[in-house]
Amino acid sequence: MKESVGNLRRLVLDVLKPLDPSIVELVQLLAEQNGVDGVNISIYEIDRRVENAKITIEGHDLRYQEIVGVIEENGGSVHSIDEVAAGKVLIEDVETPQD
């Protein structure tokens, strides 16, 4: 059997979410998903009823649709996928002269 090397290892999502559930509740729900090793949620803007959040998820064989399902079931929506990584190892961004 061929080893799976195309699996998703990291997702960075820009998400608009309601104030309820809290990020503490949402991070726990996301962390319970199959293949998830860690989740970080940072709020970068708060409005009267919503929060803009950066959600970083790392693991092995992440299931994008299941992750989006958890976010949507809790009233959120994914605005964009800001980073995605796959393969046997995670490659960090390297600063170049253009940066």
Question: How does the language model describe each region?
Answer:
Residues 1-99:
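Long, contiguous binding/interaction regions
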